[in-house]
Amino acid sequence: MTDLVVTGRGSAPVADLISSLTRDVADFPKPGIQFKDLTPLFADREAMAAVIDALADIAAGTDLVAGIESRGSLVAAALAARLGTGVLSIRKSGKLPPPVLTEEYDREYGAASMEIPADSLELRGRSVMIIDDVLATGGTLGAATRLLERTGARVTGAAVVVELTALRGREAIAPLRVHSLSRA
């Protein structure tokens, strides 16, 4: 994977590009949380292309890209189009018709659950790379891994745009192999 990208802004490491286009929002969605708003990054054509290029190097050779709703699914769809693979959106509970497989987990700011279709996909034996926007506590990636493994999928790893290292999410989901494009 090349770490240096050339954009209209000149040459810069992918991590620097991500950092420059990430907006920190204090006390959102609740007091004490420092939210990473990646909207400016995703809206920038060159930056989004650089992110997808970097992720394509990481996810090459996988059968399926699984994105965690909502921003992880946005990135996963673009990545799957680039790789020529399928994409699966791991949805928040209540967004899919039954039957579904559900996995509960804890987030940095509360408990939640996620779902995938229970009977309309054949994932057994397929290699899957999980994509999300931010790795915080590891709750979301851990739940997505458990959910996919219940189907018989072979989770080859996860990739995130930003990793919040102080929250030690990587340690919480070990031994899952995690690739982060930038760390904060």
UniProtKB/Swiss-Prot annotation:
Pathway: Purine metabolism; AMP biosynthesis via salvage pathway; AMP from adenine: step 1/1. The keyword Cytoplasm applies. Its main location: cytoplasm. Keywords: Cytoplasm, Glycosyltransferase, Purine salvage, Transferase. GO terms for molecular function: adenine binding; adenine phosphoribosyltransferase activity; AMP binding. One of its GO terms (cellular component) is cytoplasm. CDD domains: PRTases_typeI. It catalyses: AMP + diphosphate = 5-phospho-alpha-D-ribose 1-diphosphate + adenine. InterPro entries: Ade_phspho_trans, PRibTrfase_dom, PRTase-like, UPRTase/APRTase. GO terms for biological process: adenine salvage; AMP salvage; purine ribonucleoside salvage. It is found in: Cytoplasm. It holds the Pfam family Pribosyltran. Its EC number is 2.4.2.7. Belongs to the purine/pyrimidine phosphoribosyltransferase family. Homodimer. Catalyzes a salvage reaction resulting in the formation of AMP, that is energically less costly than de novo synthesis. This is Adenine phosphoribosyltransferase. It comes from Mycobacterium ulcerans (strain Agy99). The lineage of its organism: Bacteria, Bacillati, Actinomycetota, Actinomycetes, Mycobacteriales.
